Amino acid sequence: GGTGETWETAATVPGQKTAIALAYSPSDSLNPFQVTTEYNYYLIPLVYEGLFRINDQFQAENLLCESYSNEGNQWEFQIKQGVLFHDGQELTARDVVYSIQQAQSSTCFAVRSQNIASCTASGRYTLRIRLNSADSRLPLLLTMPIVQRNTGAEDHPPGTGRYVVEDVDGTVTLRANESWHGGRVPITEIRLSALYQD
């Protein structure tokens, strides 16, 4: 073994600025509902989160969802309180409704949401979903990104994830989200290296 320090070990030093670079396509969007390239698609989970994530055993784990219950094709979800979007606004059930509606018309996520007949916010943190047909696997499908409502036309709408998109004169960087609900982010900066394709 060499004596060189990997970025994983360097990232554990408190207060140390640690950066890595990842490829992305500048001609494509970082909006999770408009993304078309594989490069940018793989960046989405760094910036956005779903109600659930899929663990190593391919099971749904709560992420932005606090708890849920269902009876037949009717589901109710309690959204985690105190989760902030990158612009400081709090996540609510209305943002989740908006995001599911965006997903239903998105190339990437339409298949996951095609069984959803209706989706409504019945309180600030309560989401109700009615399915066309009962499906116990619904949490596995609700991994689609949640964005702030009414931001669907933006190139990178506010998310709740570990990184915030910073675009300065065409140079795009992902910076650690200092108010991320999951705690401290070890890698403070991800520089996006543009791939120019013909």
Model regions and ranges:
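Short, well-ordered beta-strand elements
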Residues: 15-26, 74-77, 96-99, 127-129, ...
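Gly/Pro-rich hinge or "lid" segments in bacterial periplasmic/extracellular proteins
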Residues: 130, 134-197
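A structural signal for short hydrophobic beta-strand segments in well-ordered beta-sheet cores
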Residues: 67-68, 118-120, 163-165
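Short, solvent-exposed loop/turn elements at domain surfaces
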Residues: 27-35, 59-61, 86, 137-140, ...
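Aromatic- and charge-enriched surface segment that lines or borders ligand/interaction sites
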Residues: 66-107
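Residue-level recognition of beta-strand termini and adjacent short loop/turns
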Residues: 121-125
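Short, low-complexity disordered leader/linker segments with a strong preference
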Residues: 1-16
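N-terminal lobe/hinge region of extracytoplasmic solute-binding protein
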Residues: 22-70, 78, 101, 113
